[in-house]
Amino acid sequence: FIVDNLVPYLSEVYSVDSSNLTLTGHSLGGYFGFFALFNSDTIGKNLFRNYYIGSPSMQAYTGLYDAYDYEEAYFSRKSNLDSNVYVTVGSEESQGFCMPIEMFIKTIQERSYSGLSLEYEVIEGYDHNTVFKPSIKNTLLKYYGKQ
């Protein structure tokens, strides 16, 4: 839907720079962001250059695969990942929630994908429900540079 319907529609209605699109997701949407990133060569047609992945729910049970499976499958196909990825959590989120995210970030970093710019940030003073606002502001400034 996003690739085949939403982005083409938005491109018709608005002035869209198709070379610098950003996919954003928070919580389960953040988990989906990892899915989209590691399937970008097959499903997403490399549509998105930037990804904001906020407080991804790594404990999500999909019934099939988890984020590690998607990443492993991608790595078996490719060694480059031409994307900018900004992952955030709030400092007030539980360690049990954040630890799987940090472990997954470490796995990605150890792959040394060429073309990947990966930034992980813990935003002080925010929890799972409040970290989205400062995170999306940071994302827009990073990828579009305007206030």
Model-based region annotation:
Residues 1-147:
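Non-catalytic cap/lid and distal C-terminal segments of serine-dependent acyl enzymes
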